Structures are given as C-alpha cells and as structure tokens.
Amino acid sequence: MAIEKVIIQNFKKFKNPFEVKFNENINLLVGDNESGKSTILEAIHVALTGMYAGRNIRNQLSTYLFNREAVEEYLASVENGQPIAPPEIMIELYFKSGTLPEYEGNGNSEKSDGIEGIRFTISFSDKFNSEYESLLKTEKIISLPIEFYEAKWFSFSRDEKMPRFIPIKSVMIDSSNYRYQNGSDVYISRVVKDFLEPEDITAITQAHRNMIDEFAQNEAIQSINEKISAASTVMNGKLSLSADQGVQNSWESSLVTQVDGIPFAHAGKGAQCIIKTQLALSHKQAEKASIILIEEPESHLSFSRLSELMGVIEKAASGRQIIASTHSSFVANKLGLENLILLSGDNCCSMQSLKKETFEFFKKVAGYDTLRLILCKKSILVEGDSDELVVQRAYMDTHEGRLPIQDGIDVMTVGGVTFKRYLEIAQTLKQRNSCCYR
C-alpha cells in the first residue's frame, strides 16, 4: 500500500492546491526552512490517522492550521460587508491503483474517475448556518469562527469514513521533539508500553501498588505523619503524607524509562534520537503501518551514528513507503538522490533525470555536500581550495568588499573528480552556476 500523490490546500503554508508525487519506496523531502517539509508530513499523517501533534485533530481545531493569507482574505471580505465562503482545509491522498477498490471514485478535486484515495477536510458545517448568519449580523468577526468547523474524511467513492477504519496506516517519527512529563519522555514511554503484553502491564501495576503500600507502612513515614497530625489544627480529620495511588495506570506518570541505568531525559540528545527512531520503527504500530513518516532523522547524530541509522531506515523500507524530511547531504546521498523531492515555493521537482551512475557514486561516497548546491540560489563551482580563495577575493574587489555569500552566491570547492557530477545536478535544477578554474 502506497501513496502516489498528495494535494494540499489552505493547510498552513499551502494556500493554492499544492501537489507532490511520491515513489513507492523511499522519498526525501528537501528544501529551505519554511518550505513546507514538515507540513506535508503532518498533512499525510492527519489524513490517514486523524492525529495531529499526538492528539485527535477534532480536539485540535485552530485558526493556526489554516493558511494565514486565506484567513485574512476571508476576514477582509466580512469587514467589507461582502463575506466570501469561510476557508476550507483540503488534503487528498491518491493511492496506488488496485490498493483499495472500495475507495475508488471521482470524489476528488480533479474529478477523475477510477482513482483510489481519501479526502480529508476541515470545513464550515452547514448545520451551523443559522448561528453563523446571526453572528455576521450582530457581531464584528475578527478571527475565524472555528467553533462552526468540523473535520471529515471521505473516500473518493464519496463514502464518509472514520480514520481508524482506513486500511492504510502511517506512523510519525520526530526524534527531535521532546515532551517530558514528570521527567519521563511521553513519546518514548508510550512506545515502550506498546511492547508490553496485557499481563506485563498488570504485573507492573501490581508492583507499583505494592511500592505505594510499602511507603505508607514505612516506620519513618508513620512517625512523620504522627508529627504532622499533632501539629496541624484541622477541625475535622487528620493530615498525613501518602503516595498518590491515582488511577489504574498511574505507574505511567511515576516511572521513567532508563538507558544503561540513566533516565532517558538525562541521556545525550543524540542517543535519545537514535533510540526513539529505532524503537518507533520496531514497535507494533509501525509494524502495522505501511507508511513511515520521519522528520529529520539526522538530528543530534554524529556521522558514524547517522550511518548506522541509515541502515536501520533502509531495512525498515522493505515493503513499506518511507517519506522523510532532511537537511543532511549524507542522508540524501545515502538513501539515494533519485528519491529526492525538492520543495521551492509552490513547486516541487525530482532528481530522477540524473544518470544512474551519479546516484550510485554519491551513495558510495556519501560525504559530498550535494544539498548545499541543491538548496542554494546561485553557486560558483571551483576545483580546489586556492581557487575558492581567489574567487572570493576577486568578488570582494569588484563588489565593494562584499563576500559572494552575502549576495546569495555560494562558492563551492567540489574537486576535479566530482566536478561533472555537480554540474549534472545543477543542470537538472536549471540553476545558474558559474564554473571556474577547470
């Protein structure tokens, strides 16, 4: 099961319908900051699972999910007395043909028949028409009336769906996101719990309750409670200290996950990232998921540890579709430049027109900084370090002391062997590159 294409409209960065196509196996989203890489991953995940930032999207509806320009246009129309329709978020996932025949139809923005997919919307609900009309007449609207919105899922056959019944599942892995509760990482605790069988959870609950009971029976605690009771002036009842027995699964908030005897929150950030990713790829939810979404797997990792992680991700890709965002040339080279999807403004392009030997070269020699060329606006390619110094000085002498990088021009030393391969990348991107000192 794989996604062939995604169309996003009015969700965060993307106002106009934005289309991106995917390979069946590995896909790498690259682009400058704020280019929409994370937004695409979030859009796919919420459309398949109904989850956003770890919570049900129905409980997370907010004006900040909408494209700001679309919201401002709507508010301006209301202020001018000619209100347009409230903006609507639309996310469409197009599945590989033959994956889910029952999801086939023309209920998509392209109005095309014979296509399988799911359509997710956050839109104004008609059942609130009277309330909305009253609001327009009686109050000044200065923000999107999100209380009148609802989230819905439809197959392309126009049948309404619940996300938990969508056969294609995704898992979102963001190892750089840290959410701590009582010193324990919420994400890692949830993943570890997922490994446990019901009898294991029962055993932990019983052991935790026994620990609380022992605390209450401790002689020192009983003596302290007697002092507190004697010193207090409460009219009814006695004051005392006790461990909170809480609810049935209270152990989840009081126990912490450890790595080699060290609480997970106090382990190195690099170790945390690689452990999170490895566990997330191997836990039950990921095993059931056919689509793995990974946010910047290189976070906090050294070159050698990142190399190990690439092997784990490549292994996980077997039989599943992986869509990852990255700023790392090593990740891009190792997982294949042919899988690259470059985001730029409202457009995207792939690198599949590169020669096969170029893909293979950068896979074998993954240390080259290919993304530096791919993401820059303009570049000057030179063969050696001395050439770079000469070009930098020549540019300064003719541009009032300014360095090329200050004008958005990146001077790159690429060496003689890789020169033609960098040129091939530049030609694929149709960038304007100046090549000096060959």
Model-assigned labels for residue ranges:
Residues 43-112:
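Conserved P-loop NTP-binding catalytic core
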Residues 62-78, 355-375:
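Surface-exposed acidic, glycine/proline-enriched linker/cap segments
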Residues 90, 96-218:
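Electropositive, glycine-dotted interaction segments
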